[in-house]
Amino acid sequence: MLEKEFFTEYGEASQYQIQEVVGKGSYGVVASAECPHTGGKVAIKKMTNVFEHVSDAIRILREIKLLRLLRHPDIVEIKHIMLPPCRKEFKDIYVVFELMESDLHHVLKVNDDLTPQHHQFFLYQLLRGLKFMHSAHVFHRDLKPKNILANADCKIKICDLGLARVSFTDSPSAVFWTDYVATRWYRAPELCGSFYSNYTPAIDMWSVGCIFAEMLTGKPLFPGKNVVHQLELVTDLLGTPSPITLSRIRNEKARKYLGNMRRKDPVPFTHKFPNIDPVALKLLQRLIAFDPKDRPSAEEALADPYFQGLANVDYEPSRQPISKLEFEFERRKLTRDDVRELMYREILEYHPQMLQEYLQGEENINSHFLYPSGVDQFKQEFARLEEHNDDEEEHNSPPHQRKYTSLPRERVCSSEDEGSDSVHAQSSSASVVFTPPQTPNTATGLSSQKASQVDKAATPVKRSACLMRSDSICASRCVGVSSAVS
């Protein structure tokens, strides 16, 4: 009965056996399922009436596309997207994810005996996934414990890229957003006060710092009731910003507000966080620096002494920045049917044979015009004249003489034509340097042996490796199991 209620007329549904509903929300329903053919367990996310609001449909399209382009062991993976029954009229989307048992929010809430080794390994995976994401010039923009999935073996994965954005500049900055609505408690101060018009990956690094502090203490670091209260809590700990930091704030109103704030001195972290490893506190202090220029990048944070004995650059891959061509739809106004067609095209990425047929069909469509081109008209006229001349020759009449002559005009390339080669080269160069072994057919710059080694980095080594083999810490204690998915 559950399967009939969950699935509609999607033919591929028959290969999955729904077990239970594990989540509901405004987006739809998530159910755990099992594939009888493979015996593997997955999470199927059913999104209903996707195209009712174009803005919501674009957000879903963006997230699905980003998850395909950002394949990494520390980022949740889309295994499959079911093919809609009708290309032009489908309304629902079924996305098949790898099944994760819980999320970091639940882990921190129900486990009061997490060890420093847990904290170290959780943070290492988070930063490693973020390094890969930022190297592609992608900002997550909504990092929080609920958006970090977790398993009983302490494996975590970043999820929910619905608010993520891509920067297409030479450096991953210069991005202006007016739709930023991420959770306030993990929001960087420059976003709370709209300090700048351009932001950098440092906004994600602030969120990482807040999450790290929550791991260490078991409670949110800055649980502000509103934006003003949020800034009050931040300055209570970090002190009021220095004149140099204030001078960098472009928003005059925000700069004036902070300048008029009662002078506060920073609280020593050893007082705020007693009994915490000093090495961990030094990293935390770097992550939640008030000035974004003072925060480390994900790559720099991974090199911090806190991860000594665990970090390994060979298992911390990067990738090329994402090509503009992948998100050209962001720059034009789309109708509901436009988004539906783009979504269908993205779904076909998980159906290679149909994708090939679709692309061949596009070529055929593009080769036929509603109206004949100038070349076609010339060919038709030339054929008519030849036929007419043949008739005249049969009647021994003089050949037809043209009144005017002209040379073909030289084609003038538009700026788009001139840049097509460079754009193509850019697209080709944006290949994923690392691909998880779950998708061996995906193009990758690593050998299968190397890819296997990288995936093994998901298993902690040295200090954190003891965590997995310790008799005193069982997997069920590591994670309070409560099924969750992105």
UniProtKB/Swiss-Prot annotation:
Annotated disulfide bonds: none
Residue(s) carrying Phosphothreonine: T178, T183
Coiled-coil annotated residue ranges, if any: none
Active-site residue list: D142
Activity regulation information from UniProt: Activated by threonine and tyrosine phosphorylation.
Compositional bias of kind Polar residues: 440-452
EC number: 2.7.11.24
PANTHER family found in the cross-reference section: MITOGEN-ACTIVATED PROTEIN KINASE
Protein name: Mitogen-activated protein kinase 17
